[in-house]
From Swiss-Prot:
Signal peptide range in chain numbering: 1-28
Lineage of the organism: Bacteria, Bacillati, Bacillota, Bacilli, Bacillales
Protein's UniProt name: Glycosyl-4,4'-diaponeurosporenoate acyltransferase
Cystine bridges: none
Role: Catalyzes the acylation of glycosyl-4,4'-diaponeurosporenoate, i.e. the esterification of glucose at the C6'' position with the carboxyl group of the C(15) fatty acid 12-methyltetradecanoic acid, to yield staphyloxanthin. This is the last step in the biosynthesis of this orange pigment, present in most staphylococci strains.
Subcellular localization: Cell membrane
Listed EC numbers: 2.3.1.-
Primary residence: membrane
Presence of keyword Transmembrane: yes
TM regions (residue ranges): 126-145
Naturally occurring in which organism (per UniProt): Staphylococcus aureus (strain N315)
Length: 165
């Protein structure tokens, strides 16, 4: 019984830790000015093996599950709400590309706090590493799948001269 209480207490504190840390990281991430995401940083580059996002769908079937991921805007009003996308124009697509970069960065950073569990028991470490990966890697994959497709759409719109609606 004493061991069960200890596990429940540990689970509660770990849950609260992740809730507070991830909400704060997301909140801070939304405050990063867009201009930093307009830069061409290597972390956001689509690598050759990704084949413009096709890799992610081929190996992880992204199209089948990406719509099931909770929209961050429901938890944080500062997060871009893509449901309000009324027109497809270069400004909106550029904003969406910026937001894929922001989301990817936020979720990479959200994995790092797992370090705090380094001194914990093996079970606590494994559970928290598993949680950090399962909560963040799928969102990173979706961003890496969507961004090259949005970039290609942006190129097409610019070629057609559809600057603004």
């Amino acid at each position: 019984m004493k061991t069960m209480k200890k596990y429940i207490k540990t689970a509660f504190f770990c849950s609260m830790y992740w809730l507070i840390v991830q909400l704060n990281i997301a909140n801070l991430g939304t405050r990063i000015p867009d201009k930093y995401f307009r830069q061409k940083y290597i972390i956001f580059k689509s690598f050759n093996f990704e084949k413009h996002g096709k890799f992610w769908n081929k190996w992880f079937y992204v199209r089948k599950w990406k719509h099931k991921i909770l929209d961050g805007h429901q938890l944080n009003q500062n997060i871009y709400d893509q449901r309000h996308l009324m027109t497809i124009n270069t400004d909106e697509i550029e904003k969406m590309i910026i937001e894929t970069k922001r989301a990817e960065l936020i979720h990479w950073i959200s994995i790092l706090p797992v370090i705090i569990f380094n001194k914990g028991s093996r079970l606590v470490k494994y559970i928290n590493i598993f949680y950090a990966m399962i909560a963040n890697v799928p969102i990173i994959i979706v961003q890496r799948y969507n961004r090259p497709r949005l970039t290609q759409l942006l190129r097409i719109l610019k070629r057609r001269g559809e600057r603004h609606d």
